[in-house]
Amino acid sequence: MRLENKRTIITGAGPGIGRAIAERFCVEGANVMVAEIETQGGEETVKRILKSGGTAIFQQTDTSKEDSIQCMVECMVSEFGGIDIVVNNAAAFVFGSIEETGPEEWAKVLSVNVIGYANTIKSALTFLKKSKNAAIVNIASVSSFIAQPEFLPYNTSKGAVSQMTRCLAMDLAKYNIRVNAVCPGAIYTRASEQHMDFMGLDHEKGRELFGQDALLKRMGRPDEIANGVLFLASEEASFITGEHLVIDGGATLD
């Protein structure tokens, strides 16, 4: 098993990409904390994992709040004795133009997508330092490095995740902690359905539209992102840090 007994926190592990990561990690032997703000979604992820023979616990967590993150870490250490891997996947999806984006919208997207990522790593760092081969994987986005109309708040936050990943790779290398990012393209999830709703598209037309930019002419699946995250978290990527793995079907190749 590629992650046997690896003690892993995955934030935003309700439906979608986070759930796919949690399930994939458990198949590979990881002991996973499903950290999710929505209790129903998080508990469903754990239920699915336990049913398939994996090891997972649920912790209701609001990553926009530092005390909630600290509670998450304390619970993780109490249950599993330490932390080997952190996957930052929790996300706030806030779209709009500069005129439409006010202080509340900025606070929401930055508190989860940027500050929440940083606080999760900071809170887990003492335990990651004690791990022999610790890894951090931040879920960024192709929106980290491309411009999109009326995506200002979201793209700004994901651009920050990209720089956070690079800077932390430099700062944490002395502790043998690797830090990488995965940049998904158009992936069919509940979040993508919400974006289709924002654009006034029905979901069938939305899938066709969102998939047309990919060279493979379709949207991706959450499990395809999970496979990339698994690679970066595993010993197979032991000499990789500060990198961004783009998984978008070739949509941003140019």
PLM regions: where:
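Conserved glycine-rich cofactor-binding loop
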Residues: 7, 14-15
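Substrate-binding pocket helix/loop in short-chain dehydrogenase/reductase
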Residues: 97-98, 105-108, 206, 210
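Active-site loop-to-helix junction immediately N-terminal to the catalytic Tyr of the SDR YXXXK motif
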Residues: 101, 147-156, 167, 195
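Active-site helix of classical SDR
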Residues: 121, 157, 165
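Residue(s) in the substrate-gating loop at a strand-loop-helix junction
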Residues: 141
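Short C-terminal tail/terminal secondary-structure segment
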Residues: 146, 229-230, 241-254
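Short, small/polar-rich loop/turn modules that mediate ligand/substrate recognition or access, typified
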Residues: 173, 178, 240-242
